[in-house]
Regions:
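Cytoplasmic membrane-interface "Motif A"-like loop-to-helix N-cap segments
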Residues: 69-79, 267-280
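Juxtamembrane intracellular "pre-TM" segments in multi-pass secondary transporters
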Residues: 1-7, 184-209, 399-416
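Residue-level signature of mid-helix packing/kink "hotspots" within the transmembrane helices
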Residues: 53-61, 145-146, 251-255, 259, ...
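Cytoplasmic helix-loop-helix junction between adjacent transmembrane helices
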Residues: 104-139
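Core transmembrane helices of Major Facilitator Superfamily
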Residues: 24, 105-117, 308-320
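C-terminal transmembrane helical hairpin of 12-TM major facilitator-type secondary transporters
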Residues: 272-320
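Helix-to-loop junctions at the C-terminal end of transmembrane segments
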Residues: 59-71, 257-270
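Short amphipathic helix-loop junctions that connect adjacent transmembrane helices
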Residues: 30-42, 225-241
Length: 423
């Protein structure tokens, strides 16, 4: 296998990803804005995403166990339904019980779907193409978010909130249809060979990439929830719509940089080589957002900030995911996917909730300034980890060891002979 696109069953997986993240991203800025327009508080607006992400994260903790018990097909199908259909429940109103209940149900579906989709990519693709495959995952997700994030607010202006809720529900159900085209994958086995039983706590192996990702995504929670509202202070007429456009631009940059990081990983042979520089870029982007709002600069300056943050955000995502696959044993693929998603969604949820509460006491500019500082904390953790050394990998039956086993024959024989290393 020489092309990611030829991997069996990968195209339906990509389609399901596009639909799932499209349904999520379409409502990500819409629901908090709807709460505010209905007279709700900033705290409730932030909690709509916070509760969604809380139930997402809790579900992600148990998803590896579900995959072992019932397999990928069942988990993917049920989770796609739970993400899609309940979106129509927002038609019941923006009261706290109604909106938080719907958000919780959809969070369960989103949590299981994201873990299963990430893990199944590692099952379908040979390890020598894993960096590129995870980069393509970023492109699929980025395309969905680039279209859906600005489309949500734009559609609200034209057809109203209720119609957008129905559209989101329909897109989520399309993910259910796409899941039916994914080939059966044997559930991950609970037992592994004796060589896997190296008693190194899992948290030691994944803590640094998880923290790096989580600190970056706290800013993502703030940006997706409050950037449109903050831009209304710069331009009352078009600020919210332009805010949605900036979210799309941010995800376009994220999509490209995530694929770039994947290609670098395949070329170098190990992940993490570009993590630090892109953490710096993401922190700079959020700091620029704070500066634009503080100085009351023209609204189009926000495009620069969105590009900077998106570029850093995308590469950090891919570096964190491949670092987890690289460090954990092969039998822990679903756990690696779960931890990555927990860090991503947990950071987003904590960011939206914390910064929503923070906005009750400070303005948008200092809020984004604090978000930039939180990213710097993740940068410090990564720098300390690199300074302390790289001896945190279980070098038995994990991606690092398997890559070494295929890279030596590739260097020795560059002819057309078939080489081992696929899955």
């Amino acid at each position: 296998l020489t092309s990611v696109w030829r991997a069996r069953g990968l195209k339906p997986v990509f389609l399901a990803m596009i639909c799932a993240f499209g349904a999520w991203a379409l409502l990500l800025p819409v629901v908090p804005t709807a709460v505010l327009d209905a007279g709700g508080s900033e705290t409730l607006a932030g909690l709509t995403t916070g509760v969604f992400m809380l139930f997402t994260v809790v579900t992600q903790i148990f998803t590896p166990m579900l995959l072992r018990k019932v397999g990928y097909t069942t988990v993917l199908s049920v989770s796609a339904f739970l993400l899609g259909f309940p979106a129509v429940g927002y038609l019941l109103g923006m009261s706290a019980p109604a909106v938080l209940t719907v958000s919780a149900i959809r969070g369960v579906g989103f949590g299981a779907l994201t873990v299963a989709e990430a893990a199944i990519v590692a099952e379908l693709v040979p390890i020598r193409l894993l960096g590129r495959a995870t980069g393509l995952v970023g492109i699929m997700i980025g395309l969905a978010q680039m279209i859906a994030l600005p489309a949500g607010m734009a559609l609200v202006q034209r057809i109203g909130y209720d119609a957008v809720y129905l559209i989101a529900g329909g897109i989520g159900l399309l993910a259910l249809v796409a899941c039916q085209g994914i080939p059966p994958i044997p559930p991950p086995t609970e037992k592994s060979s004796e060589t896997d039983h190296i008693h190194v706590p899992m948290w030691r192996l994944v803590l640094v990439p998880a923290l790096a990702l989580m600190f970056v995504t706290t800013a993502y929670g703030a940006i997706t929830n409050f950037l449109p509202a903050s831009m209304r202070e710069l331009d009352a007429a078009t600020g919210a719509t332009l805010g949605g456009l900036m979210l799309g631009l941010m995800n376009f940059a994220s999509m490209l940089s995530r694929y770039y990081a994947g290609r670098v990983m395949d070329k170098v042979g190990q992940p993490g080589t570009v993590m630090i520089r892109f953490q710096i870029i993401s922190a700079l982007g959020v700091f620029v957002m704070a500066g634009i709002l503080f100085l009351d600069l023209p609204v189009w300056w926000m495009a620069l900030a969105a590009l900077l943050y998106g570029t850093g955000f995308g590469a950090v995502q891919n570096e964190a995911l491949t670092m987890m696959f690289y460090r954990l044993p092969r039998s822990k693929t679903s756990e690696a996917a779960a931890i990555w998603n927990i860090a991503y969604d947990g950071g987003t949820g904590m960011g939206s909730t914390f910064y929503g509460m923070l906005l009750t006491t400070v303005a948008f500019a200092p809020m984004f300034g604090i978000a930039s500082g939180v990213i710097v904390l993740g940068l410090v953790v990564t720098l300390l980890d690199r300074q302390l050394g790289r001896h945190r990998v279980v070098e038995v039956n994990n991606l690092a060891a398997r890559l070494q086993s295929v890279q030596a024959p590739r260097r020795y024989n560059r002819g057309g002979k078939k080489r081992s290393g696929g899955q």
